[in-house]
Amino acid sequence: EALLRATPQDRPKVIAFESVYSMDGDFGRIDEIASLAQRYDAITYLDEVHGVGVYGASGAGVAERDGVMDKVDIIEGTLAKGFGCHGGYIAGPAVVCDAVRSYAPDFIFTTAPPPPVIAAARASVAHLQSSPAERRAHQCSGAKTKAALAAAGLPLKPAASHILPLIVGDSAICKAISDHLLTAHGIYVQ
């Protein structure tokens, strides 16, 4: 808030934040941040890549779950992770989306996803909009995994989300554990 307060009123301001923080599993305080943005005439840019497909009545993410989608200006999401496809998107006012299409080098100098990928993404989004079963199963699996890790006495950081932050504390040991899980069990750990 101090940065917003120190910024001249007539200067454009953007608050960029995440709905689910990937390193520690915390949820972003979307409503609180949106209120702060309104108070200081800033726009909000919400990264929902760890929330879409997993949270909300139709899988639209944490902002949908919390009933605050109308308070966010721009939402960035992925068609990977919860939707199981490839690619990403932004949703927001047409003028913003047009500016990204016109000026963002990563958008301009890339190839559009192939039609089969788009068809798969559309089918996945449509299915998850009407089926809460996958979200329930995902939350159940996450809770069971958290319980198993805690029961094994592993240093799991408490998190409200589906992300399981397991603190190893030594990068060489962490890499060895990650390699073992992949080669011995087919589990990819990031």
Task: Cite the ranges covered by each PLM segment.
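Conserved PLP-binding catalytic core of the aspartate aminotransferase-like
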Residues: 136-143, 150-185
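Short beta-strand
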Residues: 13, 76, 110-111, 154-160
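A short glycine-threonine-serine/GTX helix/turn-capping micro-motif
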Residues: 104-113
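Structural motif of enzymes handling amino- and sulfur-group chemistry
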Residues: 112-130, 137, 141-144, 150-155
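A short beta-alpha structural unit
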Residues: 22, 122-126, 161-169
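Active-site PLP attachment segment
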Residues: 64-99
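Active-site phosphate-binding strand-loop segment of PLP-dependent enzymes
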Residues: 1-46
